[in-house]
């Protein structure tokens, strides 16, 4: 669900399902989080939903290509692109960073580097109209415990505790 409309549609569907069958133990995850808008964030917040965001931070490597090709309206690339700081600043969201083997090297720290620096593959800073960088600790959590929680595996791995697997 890379686009802003798909994310809002998913959030509305979640609200509809929870209205029909309320429960507290649900998990909703949005994969390939790329473009989002204020309407999505506001809807989630206003309806007190909880959404796990799984971002592919390596999208920053292809951002310049999108910009040069004019594939997206300018506001998509300067205001709505990988709003990771907005995610971590809002208690209605959890952030994990993932790696699609075909899109990004399967090196988790590469994703953290991208999320922390917001630099493309030519080491140029992404030109956002608002700050969307995250700190290193949040980035490490996003590839460890938050990634494990998203898949309901936090009892098995994701943190350094006795009895957990290193993975």
Question: For the regions a protein language model found, what residue spans apply to each?
Answer:
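Glycine-rich phosphate/oxyanion-binding loops and their immediately adjacent helices
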Residues: 2
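His/Asp/Glu-enriched, well-ordered alpha-helical/loop segment
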Residues: 5-28, 33, 38-42, 53-167
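Structural alpha-helical segments in enzyme catalytic/regulatory domains
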Residues: 44-48
């Amino acid at each position: 669900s890379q686009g802003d409309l798909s994310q809002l549609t998913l959030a509305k569907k979640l609200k509809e399902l929870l209205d029909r069958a309320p429960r507290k133990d649900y998990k909703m995850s949005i994969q390939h989080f790329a473009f989002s808008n204020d309407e999505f964030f506001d809807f989630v917040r206003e309806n007190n939903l909880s959404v796990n965001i799984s971002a592919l931070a390596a999208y920053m490597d292809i951002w310049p290509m999108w910009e040069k090709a004019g594939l997206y309206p300018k506001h998509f690339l300067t205001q709505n692109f990988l709003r990771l700081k907005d995610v971590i600043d809002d208690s209605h969201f959890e952030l994990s960073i993932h790696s699609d083997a075909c899109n990004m090297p399967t090196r988790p720290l590469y994703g953290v580097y991208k999320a922390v620096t917001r630099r493309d593959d030519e080491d140029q800073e992404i030109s956002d109209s608002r700050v969307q960088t995250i700190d290193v600790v949040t980035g490490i959590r996003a590839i460890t415990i938050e990634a494990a929680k998203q898949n309901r595996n936090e009892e098995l791995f994701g943190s350094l505790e006795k009895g957990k697997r290193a993975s």
